Amino acid sequence: MRRSVRLVLACVLLLSAAVFASALSRADFERVVDFSVSLKTLTAVAAGKAPLPTGKLVVLDGTVSDVNIINKEEATFLVRIELISGEWIGFEDVKSYTCYIDFSGPEFFKIFPARAPKNPSPEMVFLNTRLVVIGRPVDITANHQGEKRVLVEGLLVRPIK
């Protein structure tokens, strides 16, 4: 009986989500998300070549090159990662693009473990993990060497396999 109720509730939820999603247009989505912003764009912003994109969310992809857990307490968890991507310039040079992303809150506590468990779950993020991130650019900051980076507030994160 309980299983049937759960199945019915799950079906109702999925149908409701489908109806809601079909009501959204591409224009509605583009009012919220700016797909033109990439790590390359954010690197140009940090260098002062473009304004900080604000008012919309961005979708970024790249590889985690640094993980710094700032607050280890679950309730007030805060981690800053450096996300990096790059491109070949000709046959000999590679240009890299980076930004910092802060993830805060208890929902990220299990995604960014302080130590890798013996059997990590697929949604866990470690050094060198490829990611897709949805976030909001918030500021320009500098690292210990004085290099400027755009700081993004991370809202959602998913490893790419």
Where are the regions that the model predicts?
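OB-fold and OB-like single-stranded nucleic-acid-recognition modules
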Residues: A21-K161
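Bacterial N-terminal signal peptides that target proteins for export
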Residues: M1-L9
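Bacterial N-terminal signal peptides
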Residues: V8-A18
